[in-house]
Structure formats: structure tokens, C-alpha cells
A protein has these predicted regions:
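Helix-loop element at the rim of GNAT/NAT acetyltransferase active sites that forms part
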Residues: 23-38
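A short beta-loop-alpha structural element at the N-terminal edge
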Residues: 8-23
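Acetyl-CoA-dependent GNAT
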Residues: 12-16, 34-95, 106-108, 112, ...
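Conserved GNAT acetyl-CoA-binding A-motif
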Residues: 114-125
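Conserved acetyl-CoA-binding loop-helix of GNAT-fold acetyltransferases
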Residues: 98-113, 134-139
Length: 178
């Protein structure tokens, strides 16, 4: 994938990416579209990237070596009954939104989830007014499963989110008991 002739490279995030990730999460569009708080600390991101659990997978998208987006793919919970579930969250730097960065991150995350981790279900939450993100997730097979009313406090008021999920393409449910 390229943007203006420059390839988008997705790789594993490293602690050295903390400065760039802090810049991403300082952008007004990113703050408005995620559950992160404004004014993130570089040191907090450095620690988070250095200490993330083995079950978490952090990816970054780069253009010409510059980090312009990130995605976290996490276990769906500690319950053994949800080992088949992954949860994801992503962000793209404000000035790189709409340039294919989100699609590159999603392709890499789905390859990891489907081909290597064997997640059968991926979940995410997205603000109902984040139309570009909703369109991106739908493009990659996610469907809205419900509305979470007053799910998050954002910019002085409560905001709704959609719960979205995607089942692995080969997933089949057991037959319903009769």
C-alpha cells in the first residue's frame, strides 16, 4: 500500500516509537475518536510499549520510516471461554487520515488474527459519529452489533459508541439445540 507514492510499512511497535505515538494521540481528531485522554505522556507510552503482555500485539504503520498510525490487538479477556476473542483499537495521525494507513493496519491485524493467533471473533468500539472509521471497519467485514449509550465521556458530554465485531471467515457456530 502506498500514499502519494510512498509505501506504507507495518511493523511491530517498539519502545522507540513512543514519541511518535504520543504525537498521534495528541491530535484533536484522534483524541475525539478514541478513548484516550488528551495530553498523553511520552514516558507513559514508552512504558506501555516496553511492558505490554505477550498476548498483546502492537503494530505501527510507517511512511518513509515515520510512524503515522498504530493498532493494538489484545486478548478478549482472562476467561478461558473468551480465548477465541481479540479486541482491537487503532489510530492514525490526523494529517494521514484518509491516505490508506488505516487499511494497511487493518490488513496486517487481520492477517495476524486470522492466520497466526486464530482469533475467531474480533471486537471494537467506535464513536457513532466517526463515520470514516465505521466505513473502514465495515470494509474489513465488521458489523454493528449494538449501540452503547453514553459509553464514554468526551469533550464535556457523554457519547454513544457502536459495538462492532467480525467473525473469522471460516467460523461456524454449533447448531442450536432443538
Amino acid at each position: 500500500m502506498t500514499t502519494t507514492g510512498h509505501p506504507i510499512v507495518v511493523r511491530r511497535a517498539e519502545p522507540r516509537d513512543a514519541d511518535a505515538i504520543q504525537v498521534i494521540f495528541s491530535g484533536p481528531k484522534v483524541i475525539a475518536g478514541t478513548l484516550q485522554l488528551p495530553y498523553p505522556s511520552v514516558e507513559a507510552w514508552r512504558k506501555r510499549l516496553a511492558d505490554f503482555p505477550a498476548a498483546d500485539h502492537w503494530l505501527v504503520a510507517t511512511i518513509d520510516g515515520e510512524v503515522v498510525g498504530n493498532l493494538g490487538l489484545h486478548d478478549g479477556g482472562k476467561s478461558p471461554r473468551r480465548r477465541h476473542v481479540g479486541q482491537l483499537g487503532m489510530s492514525v495521525r490526523d494529517d494521514r487520515q484518509g491516505c490508506g494507513v488505516g487499511s494497511a493496519l487493518m490488513r496486517a491485524a487481520l492477517d495476524l488474527a486470522d492466520g497466526w493467533i486464530n482469533y475467531q471473533r474480533l471486537e471494537l468500539w467506535v464513536f457513532t459519529d466517526n463515520l470514516a472509521a465505521i466505513a473502514l471497519y465495515r470494509k474489513f467485514g465488521f458489523a454493528i452489533e449494538g449501540t452503547c449509550r453514553a459509553h464514554a465521556f468526551r469533550d464535556g458530554r457523554y457519547a454513544d459508541t457502536y459495538a462492532m465485531a467480525r467473525l473469522h471467515p471460516s467460523f461456524t457456530m454449533a447448531a442450536e439445540p432443538q
